[in-house]
């Protein structure tokens, strides 16, 4: 993680872009734009949170790590939301890790600044609470999907959610990383990705996934993707 340019492009984050001009004017001096690399740890499980992060081009995964070291993704956040909800929900720490899934930029804000603004009860508070409701839906639906649906359906859901949160058709990630996110064996991801290539939905070369036909991904995915997308669109439109 490193500081980016002084220019703060808050308009690329849906939550910040939805704020009224007077709130943005008040908050803008508190924003700092930073750049994340793939694999950067945003926060550790039960670690103290000093900042919240509003991704603009980065995607951040919320991961749960078991005692035996195995991991699974609970949810992901990109330009649709914020990382560090415990700071305004009253907890202060999170039981999961937050790790950068796709390199890019984010805007961070100090915890005390966010908490003070949240306490004013304005539009910022309303948006953060609505985002939290949408995130709860994503986490819940991920649990259902991981329990009931095939690896291929899970992979389609995951690719679509990731694609929604970046401004490109290319996703840079390895099959090993995807397997860790889904909590499945790498071999299962290899087979699923191979079939998606065969039907022309994606291409995969050396850690680079190109979305070739999004409609085919949507047709192959289970209902879980649409449930999550519809809820985000409803709450954050």
Predicted regions and their residues:
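Cyclic nucleotide-binding regulatory module and flanking cytosolic helices
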Residues: 1-37, 82, 87-88
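Short aromatic/basic micro-patch
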Residues: 18, 76, 108, 172, ...
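Alpha-helix/helix-capping structural signal
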Residues: 22, 57, 112-113, 134, ...
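Cyclic nucleotide-binding regulatory domains
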Residues: 40-102
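Structural motif
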Residues: 59, 104-106, 208
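Cyclic-nucleotide recognition modules
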Residues: 75-130, 137, 141
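Polybasic "coupling" helices that flank or enter modular domains
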Residues: 102-103, 117-185
């Amino acid at each position: 993680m490193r500081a980016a340019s002084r220019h703060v492009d808050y308009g690329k984050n849906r939550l910040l872009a939805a704020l009224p001009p007077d709130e943005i004017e008040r908050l803008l001096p508190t924003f700092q734009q930073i750049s994340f690399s793939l694999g950067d740890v945003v926060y550790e499980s039960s670690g103290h949170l000093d900042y919240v992060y509003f991704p603009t081009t980065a995607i951040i995964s919320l991961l749960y790590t078991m005692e035996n070291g195995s991991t699974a993704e609970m949810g992901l956040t990109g330009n649709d939301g914020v990382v560090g909800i415990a700071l305004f929900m009253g907890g202060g720490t999170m039981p999961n890790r937050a790790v950068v899934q796709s390199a890019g930029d984010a805007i961070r804000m100090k915890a005390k600044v966010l908490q003070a603004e949240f306490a004013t009860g304005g539009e910022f508070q309303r948006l953060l609470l609505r985002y939290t409701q949408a995130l709860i839906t994503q986490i819940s639906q991920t649990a259902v999907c991981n329990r009931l649906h095939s690896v291929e359906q899970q992979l389609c859901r995951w690719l679509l959610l990731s694609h929604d949160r970046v401004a490109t058709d290319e996703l840079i990630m390895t099959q090993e990383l995807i397997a860790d996110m889904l909590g499945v064996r790498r071999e299962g991801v290899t087979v699923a990705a191979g079939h998606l290539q065969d039907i022309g939905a994606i291409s995969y070369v050396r850690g680079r996934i190109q979305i070739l036909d999004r409609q085919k991904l949507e047709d192959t995915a289970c209902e879980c993707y649409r449930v999550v997308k519809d809820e985000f669109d409803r709450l954050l439109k």
